[in-house]
Amino acid sequence: RNRQEIYIDKKNAFYKKMTKLIKGLLADNLNLSDAYMLPNLSGLEYVFTGIDAVFIWTKGGYNIGRSKNSYPIFIEILEKDKKKWEAFFSDFRIRYAFKNERKKGIYFVISTAETIEKEYCQNMPVLPLGKTVEWAQKYRFNFEPALEMLDKAYNLKLGVKYKEMYA
């Protein structure tokens, strides 16, 4: 499905008022729904990657390595936009890092690339399914249940059968 480019006029009075309102609300009480939608307000290109690509492609069916006390959200951005993203997250007072380091609460872990490959799943820009599967296979021990879900949902013919072992 073709996507239209979105242009955000940051000088628009309505945009300024809404941004001020949103900043105040998010700074005090960022929830997961808001966090996953927040990058859309940047007007910059990005894609959910890593654990979040798996989370999105499994439609929330598989989530790992996070808790209510520490919830990283993984995105990839264009290298040329790094300073703009830093300003964006700082402006919204949202925690972020360019390496995977534990922080409290909801925060973004950002990787950079010269170009971004993306597909859309549930209207969210995400690492393409094939690349997500390749990534998950590198960490098969952690993602075997997710690989089985993806195989079943998208008929990938991976032949993955996850089985829990009890000692």
Indicate residue ranges for each PLM-predicted region.
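Residue-identity detector for threonine
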Residues: 19, 49, 58, 112-115, ...
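Short, cationic-aromatic polyanion-contact patches
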Residues: 2-24
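Hydrophobic alpha-helical interaction segments
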Residues: 79, 83-167
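Alpha-helix boundary/capping detector
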Residues: 14-17, 32, 159-162
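Short gly/ser-rich loop at a beta-strand->alpha-helix junction or flexible surface loop bordering the NTP-binding
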Residues: 23-105
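Generic structural signal for residues positioned in beta-strands
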Residues: 5, 72-74, 132
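Short secondary-structure transition/capping segments
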Residues: 15, 44-54, 148-156
